Design a protein with these regions (language model features):
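Repeated loop/turn-to-beta-strand initiation elements of outer-membrane beta-barrel proteins
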Residues: 77-81, 124-128, 162-168, 194-198, ...
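Outer-membrane beta-barrel strand-turn architecture
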Residues: 34, 73-77, 120-124, 158-162, ...
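Outer-membrane beta-barrel "beta-signal"
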Residues: 184-194, 256-264, 293-309
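Hydrophobic, lipid-facing positions within transmembrane beta-strands of outer-membrane proteins
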Residues: 63-69, 110-116, 132-136, 148-154, ...
């Protein structure tokens, strides 16, 4: 879910690294706000995965949109809390997918979600963040009651100097009949006035925070390249080829990004990349694997506009 990163002084930007649901943070900077201050952030991201070949024949592609909004309030000098909402929609098209019997395993996938952010500032540069969230992930026609993902990201970071913050955390989630636990490594390292190494993503049910190398040549433009891993599950249509089953998409998206700061609080991100090590999986309603199919490197594109006030 969208939430402030545990890292201080992060820039605000967002984009979906792939149709799988990777995304950049669309929240206000994690720097401490004045007590009583409230920041609202909204974003919208159209996304696309171009044609990718399937190992046993056929290909597939998809388009979608991600919309999000968050509100963060600084209650005391050391405590801030916020709420965020998000909705993802994906539309998939399959051409002669032999591994799935020539029939599209899924078509329209929805992922609405809601999350909280709780952030504590300690002494000597320490910060702790808890981000509980709940999400419904389902194909059109599926039972939403059987499509719930829930859990939390917990992280602690320490600022060692004005140019270096490091931290560790974990994501713990129950994702449609499967428990997932994964580590999170937090980095915000200003290598020079123009170069920085940082986490581009908000960790959540689909995976960790990734890593990005950022170049800032001036006040308006920013260029970056990075990657992460992503895996997400969703409940399938009750009347589809695998009634009430579970679909899964796994991949390692790598990308380049160009971002333009349109004003003090608005930003446009243009992203192009490729999804590597991709796999599609279909399980039956009892979570027994039926089909696992690798797909070729898939070109991915995304555009995000976001603003805060």
């Amino acid at each position: 879910m969208h939430a402030p990163s545990p890292m201080p002084a992060r820039p605000v930007h967002a984009f979906a690294a792939a149709i799988a649901g990777a995304f950049l943070a669309t929240s206000p900077s994690a720097q401490t706000l004045p007590v009583g201050a409230t920041v609202v952030s909204v974003s919208i991201t159209p996304i696309a995965q171009l044609d990718a070949g399937l190992d046993r024949g056929g290909d597939f592609h998809g388009t979608g949109v991600i919309a999000g909004a968050s509100v963060l309030r600084q209650f005391t000098p050391s405590f801030a809390a916020g709420i965020n909402v998000r909705y993802d929609h994906e539309s998939w098209s399959f051409a002669s997918p032999a591994a799935f019997g020539g029939t599209a395993p899924w078509r329209n996938v929805h992922r609405p979600g809601l999350g909280l952010t709780l952030s504590w500032e300690g002494g000597s540069g320490w910060r702790a963040v808890a981000m509980p969230s709940v999400q419904w992930a389902y194909e059109s026609g599926a039972s939403t009651g059987d499509a719930v993902n829930w859990g939390a990201v917990l992280a602690v970071s320490k600022t060692y100097a004005k140019d270096l913050t490091l931290g560790l955390g974990a994501g713990v989630f129950r994702e449609i009949d499967e428990n997932r636990v994964f580590p999170i490594v937090l980095v915000d390292w200003r290598l020079s006035d123009r170069w920085r190494l940082a986490n581009p993503f908000t960790a959540g049910p689909a995976g960790g925070a990734g890593l990005e190398l950022i170049h800032t040549p001036g006040d308006r433009w920013e260029f970056a390249g990075g990657g992460t891993w992503r895996s997400y599950r969703f409940r399938l249509d009750r009347d589809g080829p695998t009634p009430g089953g579970i679909g899964e998409k796994r991949q390692v998206p790598v990308y380049v990004r160009a971002s333009y700061k349109a004003g003090p609080a608005s930003r446009l991100d243009l992203v192009a990349g490729v999804a590597l090590a991709g796999r599609l999986v279909v399980n039956d309603r009892d979570d027994r694997e039926l089909v696992s199919e690798d797909f070729d490197p898939a070109p991915i594109l995304g555009v995000t506009f976001q603003t805060r006030f």
